[in-house]
């Protein structure tokens, strides 16, 4: 199912004389993906994949998936438009995932999660260039997962693995 089927002609798209659909180049990634409906579909597919992954599902035990999806949708909307300069995303990532870092969450899990996001986008027929752009928005957050895992390991062992 293509995301353009969710929103057949998004306001940022226009039709040329040859009836080719074009995107307004100034539109945000969020809008080019198809807006709220498209991101909702991506997040739903994304969480289906995350919950089926035995290497990740343990991190979701005992939490409200509906609440997580709402947070994820808001975060992706922000990330795919423009993250406010006043928002310290690395700190937010560390704070929001602190319990999970203590459970062993690390950059290898981040890589799996990012892979599932790419697979969700692919399964919904998102164009490769848009999928690549979406993944490129998320990849810089990997450093927060490396840092969070190192902090949790230090707290657990008392050994600082980040120093030489």
Where are these regions (language model features)?
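Acidic/proline-rich low-complexity IDRs
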Residues: 1-8, 123, 129
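Short, Lys/Arg-enriched N-terminal segments with co-localized hydrophobic residues
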Residues: 3-22
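Heme-based O2/NO sensor domains and their adjacent alpha-helical segments
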Residues: 23-27, 40-126, 131-137, 150
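Short terminal or interdomain "cap/linker" segment that borders an active site or interface and mediates
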Residues: 24-27, 136-164
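Long, hydrophobic N-terminal alpha-helical segment
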Residues: 29-39
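Intrinsically disordered, low-complexity segments enriched in small/polar residues
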Residues: 32-33, 102, 156
């Amino acid at each position: 199912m293509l995301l353009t089927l969710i929103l057949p002609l998004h306001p940022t798209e226009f039709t040329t004389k040859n009836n080719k659909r074009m995107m307004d180049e100034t539109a945000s990634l969020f809008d080019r993906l198809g807006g709220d409906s498209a991101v909702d579909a991506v997040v739903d597919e994304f969480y289906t994949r995350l919950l089926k992954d035995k290497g990740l599902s343990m991190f979701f035990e005992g939490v409200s998936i509906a609440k997580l999806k709402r947070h994820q949708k808001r975060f992706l909307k922000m990330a795919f438009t423009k993250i406010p300069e006043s928002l310290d995303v690395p700190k937010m990532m560390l704070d929001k995932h602190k319990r999970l870092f203590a459970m062993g969450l690390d950059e290898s899990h981040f890589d799996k999660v990012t892979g599932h996001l790419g697979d969700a986008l692919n399964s919904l027929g998102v164009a490769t260039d848009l999928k690549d752009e979406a993944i490129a928005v998320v990849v810089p957050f990997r450093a927060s997962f490396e840092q969070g895992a190192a902090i949790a390991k230090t707290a657990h062992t008392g050994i600082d693995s980040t120093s030489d």
